[in-house]
UniProtKB/Swiss-Prot annotation:
It catalyses: (1,4-alpha-D-galacturonosyl)n+m + H2O = (1,4-alpha-D-galacturonosyl)n + (1,4-alpha-D-galacturonosyl)m. GO terms for biological process: carbohydrate metabolic process; cell wall organization. It is found in: Secreted, Cell wall. Expressed in young, mature and dehiscing anthers. Found in stems, but not in roots or in abscission zone of floral organs. It comes from Arabidopsis thaliana (Mouse-ear cress). It comes from the Eukaryota. The active site is at 249 (proton donor), 272. This is Probable polygalacturonase At1g80170.
Length: 444
């Protein structure tokens, strides 16, 4: 009897425990529904962080011979219409031959073009017959684009260079494609790429905002004409960092109506150096301001850090800093040239000029291949103002003789050791001259 009572008691206790547990579960479910706690999603319903599109799945052969343009365009169209972040992959073992192509937006979500392999252009300029000769890979109207991958973009420019009027003066001067053009793009990154042998310019930013370029190698022969490395126009908020440029023209060029540009940790050369300009051609109005070039090694170039403007233009170049620049066997290491003339015929003298002011050259050291290591040649009608030379040491490349400075209508100051000796007129004399000129003109 006692065993039966004990068993009954145990059974009752078990029933109470089960009932309590069910009640707690019900209460918990009720509480959870009130707070709308997040539930775990199954693998099939959980959104993926990024969609991957392999160009091979769109028909690309990647053998360097078959035309992969349509496959690439189809992949781009799919990626651009995707509502989730998407990555287009050109894998390491692919060489995609692409004809001129527009890769335009706007796209619905973030898009990454990962070039781990190689993209090549047709090597025959006649492919561009009837097309825009200035374009090859043309990115337009995009936001939040990233182009990366460690691979190579090859413009196959040899035949273009041979047909250039700069190589053969009997040929007409005709435009040639830029390898990578980014037009009206914003919040964009271009990083970890090799861009080589472009038909003309390698990378152009036009009307862009907030762009970061880093980890690039831009390479073409020193004899290749007009093959600027990175060309910036009508753009603002541009950062270029940790990049090597070796081409036949400017390593980096900044032209009309560009501002807020930071350039750092650059290896440049051979080529034509780092340039602002040319500006003011055909009497145009142009402005470039708030530019900093900090930490660069420039070697075996036709110029070092340069500002170049045509006579007859108007506008302003202001708030430019060139700092921590190492020169190795560079002609014209420091140059401002307001008489720039890239023409077969001599340029006529003009009475107007772009104003140049608030320009600093700080801690520029190394060797000059030209006797004139500092050349600041400014306009009679619009002299350069507030030029600073600070801690400059530019010795002859051959170790013999000395270097010189040349100044014309250049006003400013120097500080620290400056060699060759500075030739700037002080700003006080400029003001006195301006006042005197005003008094004289008042009596005429």
């Amino acid at each position: 009897m006692s065993y039966s009572r004990g068993g009954t008691l145990v059974t009752l206790l078990l029933l109470l425990v089960v009932a309590s547990s069910l009640a707690l579960t019900a209460n918990a479910n009720s509480f959870e529904s009130l707070l709308q706690l997040p539930r775990r999603q199954s693998r099939s319903t959980r959104p993926r962080s990024e969609r991957l599109l392999h160009v091979g799945n769109f028909g690309a052969k990647g053998n360097g011979v078959t035309d992969d343009t349509k496959a690439f365009a189809d992949a781009w169209k799919t990626a651009c219409s995707s509502k989730v972040k998407t990555r287009i992959l050109v894998p390491e073992n692919y060489t995609c031959l692409l004809r001129p192509i527009d890769l335009s937006g706007p796209c619905k979500a973030r898009l990454t073009l990962q070039i781990s392999g190689t993209i090549i252009a047709p090597n025959d300029p006649d492919v561009w017959e009837g097309l825009n000769r200035r374009k090859w890979l043309y990115f337009h109207g995009l936001s939040r684009l990233t182009v990366e991958g460690g691979g190579t973009v090859n413009g196959m420019g040899q035949e273009w260079w041979e047909r250039s009027c700069k190589h053969n003066h009997s040929n007409p001067c005709r435009g040639a494609p830029t390898a990578l053009t980014f037009h009206k793009c914003k919040n964009m990154r271009v990083e970890n790429l090799n861009v080589i042998d472009s038909q003309q310019m390698h990378i152009a930013l036009t009307s862009c905002r907030r762009v970061t370029i880093s980890g690039l190698k831009v390479i073409a022969p020193a004899t290749s004409p007009n093959t600027d490395g990175i060309h910036i126009s009508v753009s603002r908020g541009i950062v270029i960092d940790n990049t090597t440029v070796s081409t036949g023209d400017d390593c980096i060029s900044i032209v009309k109506n560009s501002t807020q540009i930071s350039i750092s940790n650059i290896i440049c050369g051979p080529g034509h150096g780092i340039s602002i300009g040319s500006l003011g051609k055909s009497k145009s109005w142009e402005e470039v301001r708030d530019i900093t070039v900090d930490t660069a090694i420039i070697s075996d170039t036709a110029n070092g850090v340069r500002i170049k403007t045509w006579q007859g233009g108007s506008g302003l170049v202001s708030k430019i800093i060139f700092r921590n620049i190492k020169m190795n066997n560079v002609s014209n290491p420091i140059i401002i040239d307001q008489y720039y003339c890239d023409s077969r015929k001599p340029c006529a003298n003009q009475t107007s000029a772009i104003s140049i002011e608030n320009i600093s050259f700080v801690h520029v050291r190394g060797t000059s291949a030209s006797k004139e290591a500092i050349k600041i040649s400014c306009s009679d009608s619009s002299p350069c103002r507030n030029i600073l030379l600070q801690d400059i040491d530019l010795e002859p490349s051959n170790g013999d003789g000395f270097t010189e400075s040349f100044c014309w209508e250049a006003y400013g100051s120097s500080s620290g050791q400056v060699y060759p000796p500075p030739c700037l007129s002080d700003d006080t004399s400029f003001l006195e001259q301006s006042v005197q000129s005003g008094i004289t003109s008042a009596y005429l």
